[in-house]
A protein has these predicted regions:
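Single, function-defining residue in the core of a domain
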Residues: 1-12, 20, 47, 88, ...
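Double-stranded DNA-binding cores of transcription factors and transposases
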Residues: 10, 22-28, 41
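Electropositive nucleic-acid engagement tracts
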Residues: 16-20, 31, 35-104, 110-111, ...
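Contiguous, well-ordered alpha-helical segments that form the cores/surfaces of helical PPI scaffolds
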Residues: 26-31, 351-355
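Conserved short loop/turn motifs at secondary-structure junctions
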Residues: 28-31, 61, 183-190
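Active-site-proximal, Lys/Arg-enriched surface segment
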Residues: 30, 63-145, 151-153, 255-256, ...
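Glycine/proline-rich, flexible active-site/cofactor-binding loop segments
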Residues: 39-52, 135-144, 275
Length: 427
């Protein structure tokens, strides 16, 4: 095993007994190396090529192993924050996704709305696990689009805690791991009601409804004034009505997912009382300076933020959607066929954990060095994809496995390099 990858996995040894850690390390390495469907039985063939351990040990490790996923999330969060955000505010993204499953009895699976396939006119439901994921937003050294590295997760169950309660739970857990840090949390408009109930030190950015009922801040009480203090001021026009204003707009330069843009912005401090309670918000209406896009209506609870920061923060939220796609498509997060006990939830969680570890390893070992092969039809490629990072790690692990004695390789270097290249890109 690569020394750097081995050191990364060793960071989690304290969460397991020695036998369980060996299964954990071999399982994650096999997950990286396995081409095609990531079923547990297929991973077992790579993890135990000589059959030294029964395959049921891997099923039992996920289904009923005496270890806690929360301990792994804590160790992962400490690892990621120390590497990418050692100081300053910690940027987080929050969203939920559906892992499709099939089978008559998959623990905690149910029918959920499939946000990817649903439209405004047609709602599509699918069977699977509904997962709430909290990720760390990372700006890679090569620039461009940010990355969203998962550092906590909860399984949303039918009849269980609502998504809002689970969201407050995962955020509170991360706060307990970093008690002296402040956080910038970003989520889509569905999670806007969180703004009024987040702990101190968490600043929230989300989308604002176009027809939101906004109010002025309550007026200051006069000396000797009787009666209850007012909770809100006078009713304001809706954001859509405010956007019709001809004055008050100003032009700003923003950076959205690594690209420079020109925007016209209109801002105002207000109360979205029926959603955020008495927490004041900064409303930001963002307009495309060229008039090609619809207006965006955003808000943040950080009243000191600039419009440019609010727009860039919300635009960067798309990184977590990239994470969901990559985990499903390249890590086969939906593939493990484990149906009972904690198996389905743990397998899904490990796929997100592995995604974060692959990117951390790649940034630490490769940095800005080009590790991918330029293709004739894509000569201008300047930044790595997750598949490039995964292929780089596969190449290192396959080379170590096939040619452990590098001083006297059994194949000619040209043949060995070609073999490793093919294996590393087999998906």
């Amino acid at each position: 095993m690569s020394a750097s990858w081995e050191a990364t996995l060793a960071s989690f040894a304290s969460a397991f007994t020695a036998p369980s850690f060996r299964i954990f390390a071999r399982l994650l390495c096999a997950w990286v190396l396995c081409p095609g469907r990531k079923a547990i039985t297929r991973l077992f063939g790579i993890a135990e090529p000589e059959g030294g351990r029964a395959h049921d040990a891997y099923h039992r490790f996920l289904r009923a192993g005496a270890w806690r996923m929360s301990s792994l999330w804590r160790l992962l969060a400490l690892l990621l924050v120390a590497a990418f955000r050692p100081e300053g505010r910690v940027p987080l993204d929050l969203d939920d996704t559906l892992f499709h499953k099939s089978g008559r009895r998959v623990e905690d699976a149910a029918w959920w709305r499939d946000a990817v396939r649903s439209t405004g006119q047609n709602v599509v439901h699918a069977f699977g696990l509904n997962l709430l994921v909290l990720s760390l937003r990372v700006h890679p050294p090569w620039g461009g689009e940010p990355l969203a590295l998962p550092l906590n997760m909860r399984l949303h169950k039918k009849g269980g805690k609502p998504l809002f309660d689970l969201a407050r739970e995962v955020i509170g857990e991360v706060l307990s791991w970093f008690p002296n840090r402040e956080f910038d949390l970003c989520a889509d408009g569905f999670y806007a009601p969180l703004a009024g109930s987040l702990p101190r030190g968490v600043f929230f950015t989300s989308r604002l409804r176009r027809d939101a009922a906004l109010f002025n801040l309550p007026p200051q009480r006069k000396e000797g004034q009787r009666g209850r203090p007012r909770k809100k001021g006078e009713r304001l026009p809706t954001p859509l009505e405010m956007a019709r204003a001809q004055v008050g707009w100003r032009c700003v330069s923003t950076e959205e997912r690594g690209k420079a843009r020109k925007r016209l912005v209109l801002t105002r401090v207000a109360l979205w009382y029926w959603v955020c309670g008495e927490t004041p918000i900064l409303m930001v209406i963002s307009r495309d300076a060229e008039g090609r896009e619809r207006d965006d209506f955003l808000f943040t609870t950080d009243l000191g933020a600039s419009p440019e920061e609010v727009i860039a923060c919300y635009a960067g939220r798309w990184a977590i959607e990239d994470t969901f796609r990559n985990v499903k498509q390249y890590l086969g997060g939906q593939d493990p066929q484990t149906w009972k006990g904690k198996g389905p939830e743990r397998a899904a969680a490990l796929s997100f954990l592995l995604y974060s570890l692959v990117w951390r390893w790649y940034i630490e070992t490769q940095g800005t060095r080009r590790s991918w092969r330029l293709l004739p039809w894509y000569q201008k490629k300047a930044t790595p994809s997750f598949l490039d990072a995964l292929a780089s790690l596969r190449g290192v692990l396959w080379r170590q496995r096939l040619f452990p004695n590098s001083e006297s390789p059994s194949l000619l270097p040209e043949i060995a390099d070609t073999l490793i290249d093919v294996l590393s890109r087999a998906a």
